[in-house]
């Protein structure tokens, strides 16, 4: 809340940035402003990986549950299920460090490797 379009756009355009962890509300809901979705979609279209995790202490991301999560899913945001923020950052760093083709990278992020999330 409170972030402006130019700030988000600048953050997602940082040189060398390949992935981000998006901490969302509850079951994976983010702001619904058109500009917010558009900026995320543009970043994903440029190849940025966005991994959605909940900022709640318990629970999980279920992007199909509410319209706001569905919008994120439709533009290519990945579901972090019940991964903690720390696990998501670590996994993203590890998988991106493998320097694999994009589809393999996305497949690894969608698959539990060491129990970091439950299906």
Residue ranges and their predicted role:
Residues 3-14:
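C-terminal accessory domains and tails appended to enzymatic cores
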Residues 1-3, 26:
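A broadly conserved detector of short glycine/acidic/proline-rich loop/turn motifs that flank catalytic sites
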Residues 12-119:
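Active-site catalytic microenvironments in core metabolic enzymes, especially phosphate/sugar-handling
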């Amino acid at each position: 809340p409170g972030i402006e379009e130019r700030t988000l756009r600048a953050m997602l355009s940082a040189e060398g940035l390949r992935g981000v962890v998006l901490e969302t509300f509850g079951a994976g809901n983010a702001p619904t402003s058109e500009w917010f979705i558009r900026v995320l979609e543009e970043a994903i279209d440029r190849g940025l990986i966005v991994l959605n995790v909940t900022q709640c202490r318990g629970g999980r991301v279920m992007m199909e549950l509410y319209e706001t999560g569905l919008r994120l899913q439709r533009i290519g945001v990945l579901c972090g299920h019940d991964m903690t923020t720390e696990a998501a950052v670590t996994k993203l760093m590890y998988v991106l460090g493998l320097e694999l083709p994009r589809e393999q990278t996305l497949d690894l992020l969608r698959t539990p490797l060491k129990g970091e999330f439950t299906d």
